[in-house]
Swiss-Prot record:
Name listed for the protein in its UniProt record: Partner of Y14 and mago
Protein localization: Cytoplasm; Nucleus, Nucleolus; Nucleus, Nucleoplasm
Encoding gene, per UniProt annotation: pym1
Coiled-coil parts of chain: 83-199
UniProt keyword terms in alphabetical order: Coiled coil, Cytoplasm, Nonsense-mediated mRNA decay, Nucleus, Translation regulation
Ranges annotated as biased composition (Polar residues): 118-141
Comp. bias intervals (Basic and acidic residues): 96-117
Organism annotation: Xenopus laevis (African clawed frog)
Record-linked PANTHER family: PARTNER OF Y14 AND MAGO, PYM PROTEIN
C-alpha cells in the first residue's frame, strides 16, 4: 500500500498514519526524487520483456477470432513443437497403453471363460478346481525356477569374472575355494540349461 504524500512549503512528507495497534507513526520528510520500495519496478531481463511484449495470438488473428480458435483442440500443434525424443516417448506410451488394453481384454476374456460352465456335473467341477490348483502350483514352481536360474547365472558370472582375473594376472595363486568355484562352471551351465528347458 502506497503512503499518501503531503506537500508543504518546506517539502514533501509522508503523512502520519495509524498502526494496527492504534498508535500513530510520525510524518516523514521525503527527499526529492525518492521512490518508495513498493513503487520501484521489478527488474526484468530482456527475455522476460520480450515474451511479455509478444502478442498472445498469432499474427493475423484478432481478439474476436481468437475465442473461437481456442475452443478447438490443440493436439496437432503440441506434436509439432515436440522434439524427436519426446515424440518417440509419446509413441511408446501410446503403444504401452494399447498393449495394456489388449492384455486387459485377454484377461477379461480368460476370466469369463473360467466362469462359464459347459455342464453342471460334479465330476467336471472337481476337474476344473483341481486344474486351477495345479495351475497355481505350476505358476509358483515357474517363479521358483526363474529365481533359481537368476541365482545360478549370478554364480556363473562370478566364476567368469574370477577366470578373467586369473587370465590377466590379477590373481597369481588362486585359493582352494576359487579353484573349486572354477571347477563348478560346467555344472552351473548344465543346471541353467536344464532349468531353462523345463520352463
Amino acid at each position: 500500500m502506497a503512503a499518501p504524500y503531503v506537500s508543504d512549503d518546506s517539502g514533501k512528507y509522508i503523512a502520519s498514519t495509524q498502526r494496527p495497534d492504534g498508535s500513530w507513526r510520525k510524518q516523514r520528510k521525503v527527499k526529492e526524487g525518492y521512490v518508495p520500495q513498493e513503487e520501484v519496478p521489478v527488474y526484468e531481463n530482456k527475455y522476460v520483456k520480450f515474451f511479455k511484449s509478444k502478442p498472445s495470438l498469432p499474427p493475423g488473428l484478432c481478439e474476436a477470432d481468437g475465442t473461437t480458435g481456442q475452443a478447438q483442440p490443440s493436439k496437432p500443434d503440441a506434436d509439432a513443437s515436440l522434439s524427436k525424443t519426446a515424440k518417440r516417448n509419446l509413441k511408446r506410451k501410446e503403444k504401452r497403453k494399447q498393449e495394456k488394453g489388449e492384455r486387459e481384454q485377454v484377461e477379461e476374456t480368460r476370466q469369463d471363460l473360467e466362469r462359464v460352465n459347459i455342464s453342471d456335473t460334479p465330476v467336471q467341477k472337481n476337474v476344473t478346481s483341481a486344474h486351477k490348483n495345479g495351475s497355481a502350483s505350476s505358476d509358483n514352481s515357474a517363479a521358483e525356477k526363474a529365481k533359481k536360474i537368476k541365482n545360478l547365472r549370478k554364480k556363473l558370472r562370478q566364476v567368469e569374472e574370477l577366470q578373467q582375473k586369473i587370465d590377466c594376472g590379477e590373481i597369481i595363486q588362486p585359493s582352494k575355494e576359487q579353484l573349486e568355484k572354477l571347477a563348478r562352471r560346467k555344472a552351473l551351465e548344465d543346471e541353467i540349461e536344464d532349468l531353462e528347458l523345463d520352463l
